[in-house]
From Swiss-Prot:
Protein name in UniProt: Spermatogenesis-associated protein 31A7
Main location: membrane
Pfam families registered for this protein in UniProt: DUF4599, FAM75
A cellular-component GO term for this protein: membrane
UniProt keyword terms in alphabetical order: Differentiation, Membrane, Spermatogenesis, Transmembrane, Transmembrane helix
GO terms under biological process: cell differentiation; spermatogenesis
Polar residues: bias regions: 165-178, 631-651, 927-948
Amino acid sequence: MENLPFPLKLLSASSLNAPSSTPWVLDIFLTLVFALGFFFLLLPYLSYFRCDDPPSPSPGKRKCPVGRRRRPRGRMKNHSLRAGRECPRGLEETSDLLSQLQSLLGPHLDKGDFGQLSGPDPPGEVGERAPDGASQSSHEPMEDAAPILSPLASPDPQAKHPQDLASTPSPGPMTTSVSSLSASQPPEPSLPLEHPSPEPPALFPHPPHTPDPLACSLPPPKGFTAPPLRDSTLITPSHCDSVAFPLGTVPQSLSPHEDLVASVPAISGLGGSNSHVSASSRWQETARTSCAFNSSVQQDHLSRHPPETCQMEAGSLFLLSSDGQNVVGIQVTETAKVNIWEEKENVGSFTNRMTPEKHLNYLRNLAKSLDAEQDTTNPKPFWNMGENSKQLPGPQKLSDPRLWQESFWKNYSQLFWGLPSLHSESLVANAWVTDRSYTLQSPPFLFNEMSNVCPIQRETTMSPLLFQAQPLSHLGPECQPFISSTPQFRPTPMAQAEAQAHLQSSFPVLSPAFPSLIQNTGVACPASQNKVQALSLPETQHPEWPLLRRQLEGRLALPSRVQKSQDVFSVSTPNLPQESLTSILPENFPVSPELRRQLEQHIKKWIIQHWGNLGRIQESLDLMQLRDESPGTSQAKGKPSPWQSSMSTGESSKEAQKVKFQLERDPCPHLGQILGETPQNLSRDMKSFPRKVLGVTSEELERNLRKPLRSDSGSDLLRCTERTHIENILKAHMGRNLGQTNEGLIPVCVRRSWLAVNQALPVSNTHVKTSNLAAPKSGKACVNTAQVLSFLEPCTQQGLGAHIVRFWAKHRWGLPLRVLKPIQCFKLEKVSSLSLTQLAGPSSATCESGAGSEVEVDMFLRKPPMASLRKQVLTKASDHMPESLLASSPAWKQFQRAPRGIPSWNDHEPLKPPPAGQEGRWPSKPLTYSLTGSIQQSRSLGAQSSKAGETREAVPQCRVPLETCMLANLQATSEDVHGFEAPGTSKSSLHPRVSVSQDPRKLCLMEEVVNEFEPGMATKSETQPQVCAAVVLLPDGQASVVPHASENLVSQVPQGHLQSMPTGNMRASQELHDLMAARRSKLVHEEPRNPNCQGSCKSQRPMFPPIHKSEKSRKPNLEKHEERLEGLRTPQLTPVRKTEDTHQDEGVQLLPSKKQPPSVSPFGENIKQIFQWIFSKKKSKPAPVTAESQKTVKNRSRVYSSSAEAQGLMTAVGQMLDEKMSLCHARHASKVNQHKQKFQAPVCGFPCNHRHLFYSEHGRILSYAASSQQATLKSQGCPNRDRQIRNQQPLKSVRCNNEQWGLRHPQILHPKKAVSPVSPPQHWPKTSGASSHHHHCPRHCLLWEGI
């Protein structure tokens, strides 16, 4: 306890000698000891947690993020004894340190100085300084701070008056600062002497780097720690609050020992006593270590603040005498001068400092030296800077050197190679010049002062596009370190001269780069205010310019190689008219002035950015133009330069310039060079050199032209070589693309090029006349490209010309033809509604030629000739039927309105209608219909005479297809019931229609059926009402075979209409009657007769009209039959012919939904008697098919007076049908087992009222045909039973009942012949969708329900 300070001795003595003292004294002592020990224990750990935040602008203080690690109070009491033992040792070491400091200070420390140091703090600095010891808690008495403050004034532990020094400081502020720290802040301990800081301490900014190592850095005492400088701030180490001061300022509230200790290295470096050097040797070693780490900070600090200020920051001006201050100022000044001269000696040749890195280093060092010298010549007092420390501008605060270096490097690189805003508002590279200014002389750039030299003469007609002058300060504050404009100091004349010398020696390096940019490309950069300068220095004065030019070309892609060698550094400006200096935008452009300026700037930027490509294009055009001219002649005549010629050509068409943006007339004379100024009359120039224009067509040639053309314009050899090269390229390109061109394909580049070439070609070469549309189909017509592409092969020229014609024809006539087609179709619909005279007016030849021309045009345009095909079909259909029926038939109109989806199944040429007055005649031109692969039927229709006795030759071939016979037989069989239904039953039924799909063969088959029963070829029998099958075009584009009953047709035709028919048609109808009677006679002998059907037939007998009056009427003699046949040929029976013809022609129309009941007429009675006689004759005497009967059939068209001939004809037809039916049965006998399971159920298994839900209209038509065929096959299987009841009931009743019986017992009648009703033979055209489900007959179902 002997070594303790005086206050502790008194406290311990009083506590030990006074046993009656209260326990709180001991508690206070133990608490103090514990606090000290705990502080020293945590001191190494707390040294890592420092507050290095930037200065806060708010007056309040920001707490350090690191707080005290609080421990439970129980644990703290446990460690109180150990802390008490360590506390005396720490106090002893502290007293030793203070004694050394006191001995070092000597006479500088007196009572007045100490009082000044420890006096009241400024208002803003209260609480910012802290004692060396630990902080106290808020409930501790104020006298506890005495042991901490007393050692500061005690030079010796054995002093007699220790309390004098303790009482000398002002008690108020001192105690207030301590108490405020204790109450509001966590403790900020200092490192003990035996635990130095892990990082090199740097309390104050270091002085400039000098050879003297002591002047390199001035470290603080080891009792305090602070982080290195960051963001130009100084952090007070006495507490954890982040109270920072800018450079050049030092807190005035630092504790006395800090100032005293900090002054030791400065005094020793200036020649102080040697005693204190040994005491601070450890500090100097640490300072040398931190000198290298903080060298950049030292240099930056030197560049911004005077050396005296820096020295005062470290050495505290209050502790230095006037002599010491002078010595420090002299030393710093000499150091700055030495640095400046060293930099001057290292400048040397600027060719080695062309890179931005070297320039950056040099300029940075130059700026630092200039600032240091300025600070040296005009220093500021330390105490004046402290008051305004927080009001200094931003650039005065130096940031981290690495960040500053990176920012400066970025800005300088942009300045060296071209700023981002160089094309809009940056440095001056050129200026607008008048027509009289050709040579310019200007001084180099001066960045530190405004230039007063402006050699450019300005006129009042200057373009408003000239950008507003802007000083270099708009580049931002980051450029201000380079362009110094700080108003706080003025450089000395010597420093300014040196700076100007350095800048003048460095910036001419930049000057040669801009002339090449300006003079080669004509780029006019906007000017800054009072700095309009042009750089046109001779190349010989700066040998390093070629290197600069190459570097700039590599970075900016300057195509200077395209220019002529004699125009590289020329500054001559072409003689432009006055209007070339007008604005880019028209004067009457409806925009505001501000918006106009922005638009002009934007356009100017875009032009400058794309000047390279435009310059290449213009260069290539100029080279092409110069190849056709002699360079010597142009030079002798004083011909203007290529740029002048192109610009003068661009001015020729002034009318076009009034409409579009006048980019060609840019204010800058060189701007036209950038644009290339393509001549307005491009066609005239292309005619001058068409080969070269075509050379730009292909992509490969474009790539070649983009390459720099190095040829000299005065060399004819080079011109010939380039011409040959271009021609070879075009030849190779055309050879590769010739195949695609012949196929109709054209590359995009070729199309664009030819569109451009077409402007130069004569109009007559590419114009396609309207009368020669079909010419390209033959490939003979082509564009005359010989005069344009003479170097190409003849075949290549011909193919290319033909392709051009096709291309132009397609694009020129595509739209008109598409509009013309609907108009023609609309006209055809109108024509179809005309009368007979109007329809017969235009000849079919005209229609045929028109259709043919349309087909040719469609084929030429590669479009489906649907309209023309439809027109041909209509023409053929009009030839197939009489004109008298064509105009009045509604089926003809419906056929014309059918959809366009008609397949091309009729390829033969259409028949021409007979001339007027010969309606009865038909042409003898053969008609050929392709049914299946090899099955064809050809027949010739002889001329039919209008007279009654005239014969006609129409020999039906025996090669009638099986399909035709089968369809006719099925229709005839089904009509037996349909023709004689009751009126009530017929209302709910539909006409049976056999629908056929759009297969061309099936459509041919249907037309064959139609032509089979054309006028004069066949007759219908009343007993067997045969169907006159015809092609019906349904609304959905399908075709249907529509059968009709002859009795119904007779009853439906009005009598007045029957009287108006000619006699010639009556004969054809009679022939049809005879033919159908013969066919029916054959079928009568083989019809099945079932006795079980008698009852049902008798019950059904009242439903049908009477057919025969008596059995006796069925057996007339032969003479009576002949008389009746002769009577049929008389005019009084003319309605018969009209009835049959009308029925045949109306077979092309859609059937009505209802069927009118037939009416009995005298003609019907006569027909019935005829067929009764025929049936009785055949029953008694069947006639075999012999050669004589076949001969009779052939001569039947000429002789109709003999009944034997008619009987033979009917016998032959019936036998043929029988053979065909047996053949069909034999072929399908093998398919019984396959379809047996499908047809076990009755045919009408599905209810009739549900047929609309299961089948479409097409399905119902096929179902009826299938059921009819099945019923016919069944009836033929029972000939014996039919013969037994042949004379007991009428024929039609027998067939009807037979069909009903067959429907009831389908398995009994033909168990082995359950053939699919719609499965035709292999040579039949198959119908899809008919064999996968059960079919039903609506008519038979109705009969079944009635029974």
